[in-house]
């Protein structure tokens, strides 16, 4: 075949037959495989680009869109910023400057949706930005806010109040620092200045008049209500910040108590004696002096940049001159003279709200004036300029009530009634009347009482009726009410009128179910009245019967209140302590009657309240008229149960000693204050550390880990917890001190050993702390004049061996009981050294033939330690024959086995300290 023919064969078309499958090509790709998706949740390699939101826009993209001409784009950018910052909060700190500058710039945007998105974003950002972080940028924020408040567009002004609400909530100190500008803005929001030539020479109070803008979406009255509500919040933040500043500078305490020191030094003499507390004698003598002064450093800026805020009386007076006439106009607009005749039937909701905000602003201005008016010059100036206007406009129709108006519709009438009722409940006409009363009585004093008697009597009648009306008052209403009552009591010399007012307050105090803030305010009010009466001289002192009745009922209230309200209980205790220290007879009588409930060891206030209140209650024991046996029994239980701290229990024991006849003080009031028998019974009960019932329950314990049992002693040892042991040991030292100061040492020793013989001898289970404390007291009381009861010696010997056996069998891993070893070893050795008969009886009880094989090494170790101890060496030498016999019996029992190391050591010690002594036994051949 020619080459041309072969070339044609390469391009021949294959003819396919119908019904036959197409043959597969040689280079065909196989498609019969399966695939699975691979999910990558994150990239291992970090992307250096900025995080993006759902629209893949980062922070720079979103901030750049804030400059777009379209309002929709800017709104979308603000919403995207909120979405991005909620997903990546760390961006806020990194781009805070740019975020604030762009967001605040749209406060004055002409698009309402953009402004709404900006307010929502600011509401989201404010809780996440701390004050110290936003502080450098706050002048910019304040400038944009001021621009929005003074903008000519009504919608921008309305939205600026929303921004102000956010800043007042989260940054009150920063926003009130710009008060010089913002206060002017508030004035301009509701008024405008007259610029006519005839008014140039007028004062600034007459150059401002209320403005009316018909283009607003709300009425002028509703707009003023919004502005006045924000102004009230702003002044409240300003007043709170001013009071905190004055308290930090120490001015508040100096004003109330001029002779008191602002800084007190609390000294713990135990810590000072151990060089654990350093005392700085001079207040400003440390490395960092803290000087409290009434003077402030003046600003070094130029005179033209002085901040005209309300921190000085002159600036405050200037603002009052501008705002008070405007507030009076708002009042007249809300309550026109032509409608004044119908005020008796009540004022509608919206005008009443305006009146409430007017009074709130005036009240806060009065509060600011009191903080700065140290010479009472502002008070007289306010009375001179505004008392006449206030009486004419405010007091002419006092008190005011709410007029309920129910708007009914043809459809859904019930829903309309419900909606109207909810709105009406937001208006507190009682608080309005109380605020007005507070403002008015602050303008009066005792010297002007005769001139102001008419309207003061009206306020007094209203206050008395409100207190006796039985209405449930909240803390805000009651605070105003008690403030007015206190002012009336201060300026009123008439005792009958004062008594009626106090009686009205007491009527409110007797209501059940009062909330904690309400009850606290009432207690503080009565306490203030009582302290005021006590400060007077005895001749001029007037004791109110109602106040005496209230004071006498406090102990019973405290006994029932307990721990249900610790704060209220603390306030009651402070008042009771003050009255008891001043020997108020009625209170002391009722305190005596309620003492068993107050000092109950299970549920009494003395064990359930915090430590500070417990200390005050313990101190009250010094003022109780009598201390009967049942009360002393409860006090003993309080000491030993551990519900009182060891130091407080020691204080209690010391107070009872001062009340006893052994203190050497003469008791002229009542010789039967506390009998000696009851006092000594209290000391012994506290010394044992356990009640009779608890000791009886312990006798049934056998075979438990807390009980140490030995075959050579009839007394079993109950192991107490370490905390209980240390607490018992601390109060035992106080009991020892109380017994040591009794002049007749031998008599107190006889009483103690008689009590031990009666209540402890015969018990088979004794707590380790009780045995150790008994030994400690006997060692300290024992002297040459004391005679030990023979029947007591076997019990002491058995307890001593049980304690020593417990100490010698302690394991190194038992860290809790190892801390008891030194204290118990010391008292055991001391009792054996002071009472040789106890040592002899203990040695006689060591019948090793009855001991278990595990106990023999313990007996041998005990004998070796007793031989090595120097204070006991002479007594061991006296009992050498007895010791020799015990060692012989031990050696006999161990003769069948290889001699152990402990037995070799025992033989060596015996040969050194007994056999080697000149007075020792001469023949020991049977043993060696």
Swiss-Prot record:
Cellular location(s): Nucleus, Nucleolus; Nucleus, Nucleoplasm; Cytoplasm
Cytoplasm in keyword set: yes
InterPro entries in alphabetical order: ARM-like (IPR011989), ARM-type_fold (IPR016024), HEAT_type_2 (IPR021133), Ipi1_N (IPR024679)
Domain of life: Eukaryota
PROSITE patterns (UniProt xref): HEAT_REPEAT (PS50077)
Gene3D superfamilies, alphabetized: Leucine-rich Repeat Variant
Coiled coil location: none
SUPFAM superfamilies, per the entry: ARM repeat
Keywords linked to the UniProt accession: Cytoplasm, Nucleus, Phosphoprotein
A cellular-component GO term for this protein: MLL1 complex
Modification Phosphothreonine occurs at: 29
Cystines in this chain: none
Residue ranges of HEAT repeats: 99-137
Function description: Functions as a component of the Five Friends of Methylated CHTOP (5FMC) complex; the 5FMC complex is recruited to ZNF148 by methylated CHTOP, leading to desumoylation of ZNF148 and subsequent transactivation of ZNF148 target genes. Component of the PELP1 complex involved in the nucleolar steps of 28S rRNA maturation and the subsequent nucleoplasmic transit of the pre-60S ribosomal subunit.
Subunit field text: Component of some MLL1/MLL complex, at least composed of the core components KMT2A/MLL1, ASH2L, HCFC1/HCF1, WDR5 and RBBP5, as well as the facultative components BACC1, CHD8, E2F6, HSP70, INO80C, KANSL1, LAS1L, MAX, MCRS1, MGA, KAT8/MOF, PELP1, PHF20, PRP31, RING2, RUVB1/TIP49A, RUVB2/TIP49B, SENP3, TAF1, TAF4, TAF6, TAF7, TAF9 and TEX10. Component of the 5FMC complex, at least composed of PELP1, LAS1L, TEX10, WDR18 and SENP3; the complex interacts with methylated CHTOP and ZNF148. Component of the PELP1 complex, composed of at least PELP1, TEX10 and WDR18.
Family label: Belongs to the IPI1/TEX10 family.
The protein, known as: Testis-expressed protein 10
Highest classification ranks of the organism: Eukaryota, Metazoa, Chordata, Craniata, Vertebrata
Gene responsible for this protein: Tex10
């Amino acid at each position: 075949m020619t080459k041309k023919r072969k070339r044609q064969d390469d391009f021949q078309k294959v003819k396919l037959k119908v019904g036959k499958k197409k043959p597969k090509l040689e280079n065909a790709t196989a498609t019969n495989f399966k695939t699975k998706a691979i999910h990558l949740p994150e990239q291992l390699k970090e992307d250096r680009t900025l995080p993006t939101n759902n629209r893949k826009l980062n922070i720079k993209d979103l901030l750049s869109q804030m400059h777009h001409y379209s309002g929709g784009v800017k709104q979308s950018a603000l919403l995207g910023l909120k979405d991005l910052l909620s997903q990546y909060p760390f961006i806020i700190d990194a781009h805070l400057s740019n975020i604030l500058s762009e967001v605040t710039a749209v406060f004055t945007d002409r698009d309402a949706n953009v402004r709404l998105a900006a307010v929502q974003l600011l509401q989201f950002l404010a809780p996440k930005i701390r004050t110290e972080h936003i502080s450098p940028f706050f002048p910019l924020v304040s400038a944009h806010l001021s621009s929005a408040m003074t903008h000519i567009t009504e919608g921008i002004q309305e939205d600026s109040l929303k921004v102000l609400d956010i800043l007042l909530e989260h940054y009150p100190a920063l926003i009130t620092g710009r008060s010089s500008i913002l206060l002017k803005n508030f004035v301009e929001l509701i008024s405008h200045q007259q610029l006519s030539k005839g008014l140039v020479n007028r004062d600034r109070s007459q150059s401002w008049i209320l403005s009316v803008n018909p283009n607003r979406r709300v009425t002028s009255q509703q707009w003023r209500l919004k502005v006045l509500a924000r102004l009230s919040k702003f002044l409240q933040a300003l007043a709170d910040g001013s009071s905190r500043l004055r308290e930090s500078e120490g001015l508040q305490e100096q004003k109330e108590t001029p002779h008191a020191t602002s800084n007190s030094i609390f000294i713990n003499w135990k810590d000072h004696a151990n060089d654990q507390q350093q005392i700085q004698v001079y207040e400003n003598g440390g490395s960092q002096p803290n000087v409290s002064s009434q003077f402030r450093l003046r600003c070094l800026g130029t005179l033209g940049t002085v901040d005209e805020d309300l921190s000085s009386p002159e600036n405050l007076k200037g603002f009052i001159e501008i705002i008070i006439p405007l507030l009076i106009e708002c009042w007249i607009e809300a309550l026109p003279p032509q409608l004044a005749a119908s005020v008796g039937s009540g004022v509608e909701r919206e005008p009443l709200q305006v009146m409430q905000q007017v009074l709130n602003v005036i009240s806060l201005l009065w509060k600011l004036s009191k903080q700065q008016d140290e010479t009472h010059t502002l008070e007289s100036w306010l009375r001179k300029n505004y008392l006449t206007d206030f009486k004419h406009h405010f007091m002419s129709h006092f008190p005011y009530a709410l007029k309920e108006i129910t708007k009914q519709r043809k459809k859904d009438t019930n829903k309309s009634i419900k909606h109207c009722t909810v709105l009406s409940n937001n208006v507190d006409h009682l608080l309005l009347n109380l605020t007005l009363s507070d403002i008015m009585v602050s303008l009066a004093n005792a010297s002007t009482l005769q001139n102001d008697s008419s309207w003061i009597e009206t306020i007094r009648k209203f206050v008395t009726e409100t207190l006796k009306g039985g209405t449930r008052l909240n803390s805000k209403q009651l605070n105003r009410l008690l403030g007015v009552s206190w002012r009336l009591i201060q300026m009123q010399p008439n005792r009958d009128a004062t008594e009626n007012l106090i009686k009205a307050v007491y009527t409110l105090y007797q209501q059940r179910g009062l909330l904690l803030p309400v009850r606290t305010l009432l207690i503080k009010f009565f306490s203030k009245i009582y302290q005021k009466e006590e400060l007077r001289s005895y001749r001029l002192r007037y004791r109110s019967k109602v106040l005496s009745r209230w004071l006498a009922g406090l102990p019973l209230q405290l006994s029932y209140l307990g721990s249900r309200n610790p704060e209220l209980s603390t306030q009651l205790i402070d008042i009771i302590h003050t009255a008891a220290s001043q020997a108020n007879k009625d209170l002391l009588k009722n305190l005596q009657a309620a003492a068993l409930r107050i000092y109950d060891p299970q549920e009494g206030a003395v064990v359930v309240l915090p430590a500070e209140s417990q200390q005050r209650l313990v101190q009250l024991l010094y003022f109780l008229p009598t201390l009967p046996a049942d009360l002393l029994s409860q006090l003993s239980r309080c000491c030993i149960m551990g519900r009182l701290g060891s130091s407080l229990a020691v204080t209690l024991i010391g107070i009872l000693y001062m009340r006893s006849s052994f203190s050497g003080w003469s008791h002229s009031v009542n010789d039967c204050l506390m009998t000696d028998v009851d006092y000594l019974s209290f000391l012994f009960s506290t010394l044992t550390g356990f009640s009779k019932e608890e000791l009886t329950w312990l006798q049934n314990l056998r075979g438990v880990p807390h009980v140490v049992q030995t075959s050579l002693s009839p007394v079993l040892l109950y192991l107490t917890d370490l905390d209980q042991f240390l607490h018992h040991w601390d109060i035992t030292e106080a009991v020892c001190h109380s017994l040591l100061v009794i002049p007749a040492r031998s008599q107190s020793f006889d009483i103690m050993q008689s009590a031990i013989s009666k209540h402890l001898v015969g018990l088979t289970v004794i707590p380790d702390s009780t045995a150790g404390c008994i030994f400690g007291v006997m060692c300290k009381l024992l002297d040459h004049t004391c005679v030990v009861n023979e029947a007591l010696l076997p019990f002491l010997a058995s307890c001593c061996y049980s304690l020593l056996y417990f100490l010698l069998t302690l394991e190194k891993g038992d860290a809790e009981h190892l801390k008891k070893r030194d204290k118990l070893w010391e008292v055991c050795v001391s009792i054996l050294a002071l009472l040789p008969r106890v040592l002899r009886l203990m040695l006689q009880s060591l019948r090793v033939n009855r001991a278990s094989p595990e106990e023999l090494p313990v007996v041998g170790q005990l004998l070796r330690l007793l031989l090595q101890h120097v204070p006991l060496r002479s007594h061991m030498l006296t009992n050498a024959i007895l010791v020799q016999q015990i060692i012989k019996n031990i050696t006999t029992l161990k003769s069948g086995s290889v001699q152990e190391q402990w037995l070799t050591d025992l033989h060596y010690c015996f040969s050194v300290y007994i056999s080697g002594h000149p007075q020792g036994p001469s023949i020991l051949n049977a043993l060696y």
